[in-house]
Amino acid sequence: MKFDTVIMGGGLAGLLCGLQLQQHGLRCAIVTRGQSALHFSSGSLDMLSALPDGQPVTEITAGLDTLCRQAPEHPYSRLGAQKVLTLAQQAQTLLNASGAQLYGDVQQAHQRVTPLGTLRSTWLSSPEVPVWPLFAQRICVVGVSGLLDFQAHLAAASLRQRDLNVETAEIDLPELDILRDNPTEFRAVNIARLLDNEEKWPLLYDALSPMATNCDMIIMPACFGLANDTLWRWLNERLSCALTLLPTLPPSVLGIRLHNQLQRQFVRQGGIWMPGDEVKKVTCRHGIVSEIWTRNHADIPLRPRFAVLASGSFFSSGLVAEREGIREPILGLDVQQTATRAEWYQQNFFDPQPWQQFGVVTDDAFRPSLAGNTVENLYAIGSVLAGFDPIAQGCGGGVCAVSALQAAHHIAERAGEQQ
């Protein structure tokens, strides 16, 4: 099977890369083993929250300029501030075109409220998520009886520290009892599958309506809206106060929805989606990827003109830690890591951890190297890249988006030259 591009990994980076390549008229396939990290995320995307020295970032352009000086090997630094901003804006346009109407400005970070009621600087958030400052003085944090993925009293306690009048309440929907037989089934995603049925909408409205009369804003867990935000908008039109939603513990409704929107758009535009498959071997001849062998296709290789590695970091098994060191399991690419295992981590759990910055070694075009030699038609994007800390620096979503589009533009340019 011949393709212009085969993308190994179906997470945020892989999907955005595929969508951008489709804009250039290239035929793409995505090989994905299972759920991506988006299923376990908040559904919000960070651009740059903090610098390597710990200084918080509010003005993105100035932050990117400082980052170039502090961390020249960071993926952003390799591209330059202006290029990063341009690609980020293009990514936001792609997301909107896919149906993910996210709120945010690439030039200026905003503060979203987290499930614990604290604030986190971010780039793009779902419109349901409350954003600071909250234009409400009387707030009711509403939990769902029996739902362990969200603790209303913890969120309320944090918000009270910001001089807000915050109460807590709980709704009990007997219609959800069918899920209570097994506590492991009473999760936000399973509740959403039930509440998203239009016939159940009035039940949720009736439960929230009495609380809405006594407050300016209701904050509740995101336990509905797997496909879209229609129910949230329907409730907001009818309730006497604003309704906002907070992400829950994984799996996350908002994260799954974002992934599904991108995946459906990719298939709608003619992309080949290969779920439940796994790349077992990649054949490289003379520094060029010629064949990609997958588990489900056995002796029928995929033959791409270009290949993209979007396999993620340790969480997605894009990187594997062993006693002897860190390795990239598909091709055995060169990995940037510390010299000894003792340097992988800091003793204080909350300090930035060196292992977070491990990843494949690439050139400035994000082409990785194998045994010191650049693989000419292979690009690495997203969390598998080295040189950034997605947790401490708050840049995971941005790096995925920016590197994906940079690789896509590079491939499209080279594909045009080869025709």
Curated annotation (Swiss-Prot):
One annotated GO molecular function is: glycerol-3-phosphate dehydrogenase (quinone) activity
Give the enzyme's EC designation: 1.1.5.3
Top enzyme class, one word, equals oxidoreductase
Pathway in which the depicted protein is active? Polyol metabolism; glycerol degradation via glycerol kinase pathway; glycerone phosphate from sn-glycerol 3-phosphate (anaerobic route): step 1/1
Report if keyword Flavoprotein is assigned.
yes
UniProt keyword annotation of Oxidoreductase present: yes
Keyword annotations for this protein, in alphabetical order, are: Flavoprotein, FMN, Oxidoreductase
Q: What cofactors does this protein use?
A: FMN
Any one GO CC term of this protein is: glycerol-3-phosphate dehydrogenase (FAD) complex
Its GO biological process annotations read: glycerol catabolic process
Q: Which reaction does it catalyse?
A: a quinone + sn-glycerol 3-phosphate = dihydroxyacetone phosphate + a quinol
The record's Pfam families line, in alphabetical order, gives:
FAD_binding_2
Q: Which protein family is named in the record?
A: Belongs to the anaerobic G-3-P dehydrogenase subunit B family.
Q: HAMAP family given for it? A: Glycerol3P_GlpB (MF_00753)
* Summary of the function given for this chain in its UniProt record: Conversion of glycerol 3-phosphate to dihydroxyacetone. Uses fumarate or nitrate as electron acceptor.
Oligomer and partners? Composed of a catalytic GlpA/B dimer and of membrane bound GlpC.
NCBIfam families registered for this protein in UniProt: glycerol3P_GlpB, PRK05329.1-1, PRK05329.1-2, PRK05329.1-3
Name it.
Anaerobic glycerol-3-phosphate dehydrogenase subunit B
Species of origin reads Salmonella arizonae (strain ATCC BAA-731 / CDC346-86 / RSK2980)
Q: Which gene encodes it?
A: glpB
